[in-house]
Amino acid sequence: MQQIYEKDALIPPSACDYDGLLSYPGTFALFMDLATEHALHLGVGFAAMRERDCFWLTVKTKIVFHDRPALSEAVRLATWPEKPGPLRFNRSYELRRSEELLISGRTEWAVLNTAAGTLVPSADIMPAGLAYEHGSAVSESYARIPDRFADADAFAEYTVRSADIDIGGHMNNAAYPRALFASFPSGELKARNIRCVDLLFRAPCFEGDLLTLYKKESEGILDLRMARAEETVLLARLAE
């Protein structure tokens, strides 16, 4: 059984930003879709997991941007599961222009037994015989972001909409970065030379939830907190 899943693709206009480049939130969605395709091949896709009362949970994601491809540009996508721990899984991603690495990413997952409300051991999930021959596409650790920011400024609000909700009944993973980046003017995003984005998922959100966004900036780093009242639901770091 092959550890790596690869495919050729064209960057779709729906995933591009105001500059005609693959957007930051579009990258998260592209990698999530790629992981979903590979999960089907491995027998751990949504339908197969639902039959076992299991559901994939995204814990955290880091994406490193060396360059971003343009609208309709031909790229090569690759993803693979890393050797799992007892309860946590990591998956790597790469996006290349020919042999040139443009974007690399890594996501930590867990599997929830929806009937029992407990995490499922990795030995009960991944197919037997899968060779874990490839390490991580990202050498840096996931960001460690404080759950509370001292003297942080609230700068935006976002109400979770019906279009944000997925089949699990809560806000889709790809909707969080979309809401996050949409809270900034395009001019400010253009002025930032964003090279790395970390997302740390803390709590599920539901349609109608009012989320407040806070920010705290230091040299080259912008930390963000998304909260529902006092509860932190998402932490993010944009690094230049």
Per-segment meaning from a language model:
Residues 2-7, 62-66, 70-148, 201-207, ...:
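HotDog/MaoC-like acyl-thioester-processing domains
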Residues 187-216:
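A conserved acidic, glycine/proline-rich C-terminal tail/linker
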